[in-house]
Amino acid sequence: MTQLIVYEAGNPSHVLLQTSDFDVIAGKVAALGARIERWEARHPIAPGASNEEVLSAYGHEIDRLKRERGYTNGDVVRIKPGNPNWPELRGKFLQEHVHVEDEVRFFVEGTGAFYLHLDDKVYQLVGEAGDLLSVPHGVKHWFDGGPEADFTCIRLFTNQEGWVAHFTGDAISDAFPKYEIAA
């Protein structure tokens, strides 16, 4: 389920807010300059659909965001349980970093959590299938798909190189609860 948990940055055991009310989440996220939306596919996506079929199913929404925000390219990333590359990728995504462009992810399937580090708070934003999450450029953050990640995401970019992180060197993410997929 879509969820927002707000922590004190200096005291990860102190939860300031925990909610799964989408309207509350959308308001809090917008106040941070971030974005969350719910999308529906224009037509069903079959299991094992190609990347092109996935992108086509959400073409209307993707085109709208491209017009609004200047995104020039996108791709599909799929991580399934047992992926031998996930531990290395997870280690990289768990390091606090920033981007020179917004980090835009739409969850086609599965779930994952972005952690936004702003001032004296950390906002854990859990997205699920149907959620579009956008972290503004320059915002310190990290991502976790859990120990056995299971998600398919559409990613949108303005940078032709795709995902380029600038790591802060701050180990703050080590102090916060890792994301665990609810059973």
Curated annotation (Swiss-Prot):
Required cofactor(s): Fe(2+); Ni(2+)
Reaction(s) catalysed (UniProt annotation): 1,2-dihydroxy-5-(methylsulfanyl)pent-1-en-3-one + O2 = 3-(methylsulfanyl)propanoate + CO + formate + 2 H(+); 1,2-dihydroxy-5-(methylsulfanyl)pent-1-en-3-one + O2 = 4-methylsulfanyl-2-oxobutanoate + formate + 2 H(+)
InterPro entries: ARD, ARD_bac, RmlC-like_jellyroll, RmlC_Cupin_sf
Site (May play a role in transmitting local conformational changes): D102
Residues that coordinate or bind Ni(2+): H97, H99, E103, H141
One example of a Gene Ontology biological process annotation: L-methionine salvage from methylthioadenosine
Keyword annotations: Amino-acid biosynthesis, Dioxygenase, Iron, Metal-binding, Methionine biosynthesis, Nickel, Oxidoreductase
SUPFAM superfamilies (alphabetical): RmlC-like cupins
Recorded family membership: Belongs to the acireductone dioxygenase (ARD) family.
Protein name: Acireductone dioxygenase
